[in-house]
Swiss-Prot record:
The gene is rpmC. GO terms for cellular component: cytosolic large ribosomal subunit. This is Large ribosomal subunit protein uL29. GO terms for biological process: translation. Gene3D superfamilies: 1.10.287.310. It comes from the Bacteria. The keyword Ribosomal protein applies. Keywords: Ribonucleoprotein, Ribosomal protein. The keyword Cytoplasm does not apply. InterPro entries: Ribosomal_protein_uL29, Ribosomal_uL29, Ribosomal_uL29_sf.
Length: 70
């Protein structure tokens, strides 16, 4: 799965953003589990998932800050 551009992430609604964050966190959990049981073959997915999660959390944080300052 290709990493989405930040402009695509900012277009998501708040609910879609929360769902995507939950989805990426579950994926990271599954990747950690596979690594612990030595079943992981795609180790590059860790980096991609962490970067994508960071992007999503950044957008969510920006929205929360803009809502509280308004």
């Amino acid at each position: 799965m290709a990493r989405p551009e930040i402009s695509e992430v900012t277009k998501l609604t708040d609910d879609d953003l929360k769902n995507k964050i939950d989805e990426i966190r579950k994926e990271l959990f599954d990747l950690r589990f596979k690594r612990a049981t030595r079943q992981l073959s795609e180790t590059h997915r860790f980096k991609e998932a962490r970067i994508q999660l960071a992007q999503l959390l950044t957008v969510q944080g920006d929205r929360n800050r803009s809502k509280t300052s308004s």
